[in-house]
UniProtKB/Swiss-Prot annotation:
It is a multi-pass membrane protein. It comes from Saccharophagus degradans (strain 2-40 / ATCC 43961 / DSM 17024). Keywords: Cell inner membrane, Cell membrane, Chaperone, Membrane, Protein transport, Transmembrane, Transmembrane helix, Transport. The lineage of its organism: Bacteria, Pseudomonadati, Pseudomonadota, Gammaproteobacteria, Cellvibrionales. Its main location: membrane. Residues 52-71 are annotated as: Disordered. This is Membrane protein insertase YidC. The chain crosses the membrane at residues 1-21, 346-366, 369-389, 439-459, 470-490, 517-537. The gene is yidC. Required for the insertion and/or proper folding and/or complex formation of integral membrane proteins into the membrane. Involved in integration of membrane proteins that insert both dependently and independently of the Sec translocase complex, as well as at least some lipoproteins. Aids folding of multispanning membrane proteins. GO terms for molecular function: membrane insertase activity.
């Protein structure tokens, strides 16, 4: 009995420690500057101001990370004329994107349906941007052979019909950037679809020459190592790269890994992504092509996530196309599932994803019925409690019987307290005589721990709960309770539940158990309100069930 109780206490303490560390990593990696700590003098504010064309021209060529690839074809000389790049702004119902005509790079992505701060309704979330304080951009091009992009050639100098595009009442908006080579015309086409964060990037090559035209499509995500400011006790979720490989459906490649050396893999299809809390950017190259992936740190100190597709060849006097998808938006599980296999795994539900994923679908279904995520969490808690009703009842019956045996156990302790072996033997005889399973109160609780851990990660990772209100003072279920009312209620319910449990025979164990409500209350003050809400409701239901069972057993004598 003692070893199992000790194991249960140890398991709870270990889980608490792990969750606390995940929540309190703000003190680590101080050598990496955070975005919030950058100097105040920023040349281009995140959203309100649009960088000038001159700024675009200088920033676009600052990082020489264009791949130099070998393709058997007649090279095309770079144009000699003076080129003035332009910044193209595209606005849909969910995105505002800024594209540089010098290379056709994505320099800024604003998510119009997501706020940077819930307190400011006029400030949408800026996912990607480039200014003096921060670099996070996406690039793509055609390199090698006849391609206009390259480390030596520089970037393709595109022209555009206009610099502002809006979706309006249409389902799609198409932005064409054009480039005239000596014997070919290249159109880089961006297609934006209503209510979608996936941008189709397609190259249309019209070969006017008598020889084949050939180049390789590449795409890059370039980001510095700065991290968002999470604030005091703020959770530090994973920020870094992730990729799918032939061996592993989802593999993280951290910035530290790239500091140690490049990560390379070649496969058919696939994807490469940069993930952060709630949001993701990802290149999804041609699914039927063999693509080479490389994740590395550049000489400029930025992290480069790159794919290079196989050679695209266009026959003489023919038209050819090659395209890739670029996603920049929230980590919505259903959207990501539709885009590419295993891309939904970037929603990091931890090693218990196979439990957390069904929990989210259940929560999402309930939310569709009630329209409030807080109410949905309460109803999901009731559902989970119903699933574990009988295992919990077994546990509470065992605990109630153990409470009845405490006077006899105390008597045995006085009689055989110095002889632990004799004491253990007499306890087992007592359990057998009274038909009590000393393990019955612990095992059902251990069975429920994976569900709690899964629910923790599900609530932490679900962008759907970001900035979502419950009622009254709780206006965001994804952050801590501002008044700490829920954590205090959680501590009270834990204390009441302990009073219904048998007192551990070991004084040290008893002291540890007495301190747990206080420790958990302090810890949960900094947990998301949605998670604490689950715990409070679960404890309340458990108290009700345990009280009824304990009272019935005590009445039965």
């Amino acid at each position: 009995m003692n070893w199992l109780r000790n194991s249960l206490i140890a398991a709870i303490l270990v889980i608490t420690y792990v969750l606390f560390i995940r929540w309190n990593e703000f003190s680590e990696r101080q050598q990496v500057p955070t975005i919030a700590n950058q100097p105040a003098a920023v040349t281009t504010p995140a959203y309100e101001a649009v960088p000038s064309d001159d700024a675009v021209a200088s920033s676009a060529t600052e990082e020489s990370d264009v791949p130099e690839v070998s393709v058997s074809a007649e090279p095309v000389a770079a144009p000699k004329a003076v080129y003035q790049p332009k910044l193209v702004t595209v606005k849909t119902d969910v995105l505002e994107v800024q594209i540089d005509t010098n290379g056709g790079d994505v320099l800024q992505v604003v998510l119009l349906k997501h706020l940077a701060d819930k307190a400011d309704d006029n400030q949408p979330f800026v996912l990607m941007t480039q200014n003096s304080a921060h670099t996070y951009v996406a690039r793509s091009g055609l390199a090698g052979g006849n391609g206009p992009d390259g480390a030596k050639k520089g970037r393709a100098k595109y022209s555009v019909a206009k610099t502002n595009y809006s979706l309006n009442s249409d389902d799609q908006v198409v932005v064409d950037l054009t480039l005239d080579q000596e014997n070919a015309q290249i159109t880089k086409r961006f297609t934006f679809t209503k209510s979608s964060y996936l941008i189709d990037v397609e190259y249309i090559i019209t070969n006017r020459a008598d020889t084949p035209w050939a180049a390789k499509l590449y795409g890059q995500i370039i980001r510095d190592g700065s991290e968002p400011s999470y604030g005091y006790m703020g959770m530090r979720p994973y920020l870094g790269a992730a990729i799918t490989t032939p061996e592993v459906n989802y593999e993280k490649v951290s910035f530290d890994d790239m500091d140690d050396g490049p990560f390379k893999v070649e496969q058919k299809g696939g994807w490469v992504s940069l993930i952060q809390h709630y949001f993701i950017s990802a290149w999804i190259p041609p699914k039927d092509a063999t693509n080479s992936y490389e994740l590395s740190k550049s000489s400029k100190g930025n992290y480069v996530l790159r794919f290079i597709s196989e050679t695209t060849t266009v026959a003489p006097h023919s038209v050819g196309t090659v395209k890739a998808g670029f996603y920049a938006g929230p980590k919505n599980i259903r959207r990501l599932e539709e885009i590419s296999p295993h891309l939904d795994l970037t929603i990091d539900y931890s090693f218990l994803w196979f439990i957390a994923k069904p929990l989210f679908f259940a929560l999402d279904f309930i939310h569709g019925l009630v329209g409030n995520w807080g109410v949905a969490i309460i109803l999901l808690t009731v559902l989970i409690k119903a699933v574990f009703f009988y295992p919990s009842a077994m546990s509470y019956r065992s605990m109630a019987k153990m409470r009845k045996l405490q006077p006899m156990m105390a008597e045995l302790k006085e009689r055989y307290g110095e002889d632990k072996q004799k004491m253990s033997g007499e306890l087992m005889k007592l359990y057998k005589k009274e038909k009590v399973n000393p393990f019955g109160g612990c095992l059902p609780i251990l069975l429920q721990m994976p569900v709690f851990i899964s629910l923790y990660w599900m609530i932490m990772e679900s962008v759907e709960l970001r900035h979502q209100p419950f009622f009254l003072w709780i206006q965001d279920l994804s952050v801590k309770d501002p008044l700490f009312i829920l954590p205090l209620l959680m501590g009270v319910t834990m204390y009441i539940q302990q009073k219904l449990n048998p007192t551990p025979p070991d004084p040290m164990q008893a002291k540890v158990m007495q301190m747990m409500p206080i420790g958990f209350t302090f810890l949960f003050m900094f947990f998301p309100a949605g998670l604490v809400l689950y715990w409070v409701v679960n404890n309340t239901l458990s108290i009700s069930q345990q009280y009824v069972i304990t009272r019935n057993i005590e009445k039965a004598g």
